[in-house]
Amino acid sequence: MTEIAKIPPRPKYHDPVVVERAVERLVKPVQEWIDLRAQFQPKDLKSQLTDCIHNNGYEYAKELEERYGWEPDSALVECLDRLDIQSAHQHVVRAWVTLYSVKIPFNIGDRVCTPTLRAGTVKDFDRSTAQLAVQSDENRDEGKDYRTLIDFEDAIPILGTIGEAAPAEGGAA
């Protein structure tokens, strides 16, 4: 079983290492945009892109204009729209799983809940990101095979379902 106390928390979308990873993929196309316009040469392109990060290319460009005097156009907005924080986050989480040898302490068939999922059954895993694919009881009852990805550390085992039968309530067992 994973010893949670020794493993630092799972990286979040807003963590500096995730933002840095996402911005690194923008530096080259934005630098090419700057080179074509020769309007200016920012002293620290990467830090300006990091300071103004936004998931909407237009808003991102607007922030660069307001804070650093950039003169954005549609080509820059298109470059900035390529920001992929989700991909960067997955990359950082995979590295976290590998670095700390994170193991999922659940089995397929285990019953779990979370603050946002009343109850469900573990149907599969994504070991690379230490996540459970859980089918909620509601989806099961409706005949839907939808699964929700849940970070393993957010899953709470439903008592009596991991390795042993639930005790009988209110009567003889």
Predicted features, each with a name:
Residues 115-152:
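Basic/aromatic-rich interaction segments and small domains that mediate binding to polyanionic partners
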Residues 1-4, 15, 105, 109, ...:
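Low-complexity, intrinsically disordered short peptide segments enriched in small/polar/basic residues
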Residues 69-108:
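Mixed-charge, Lys/Arg-rich low-complexity intrinsically disordered regions
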Residues 1-71:
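N-terminal intrinsically disordered, low-complexity, charge/repeat-rich segments that act as generic
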Residues 6, 23, 39, 62, ...:
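Intrinsic disorder/low-complexity segments
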Residues 86-101, 138-173:
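Intrinsically disordered, low-complexity, charged/polar segments
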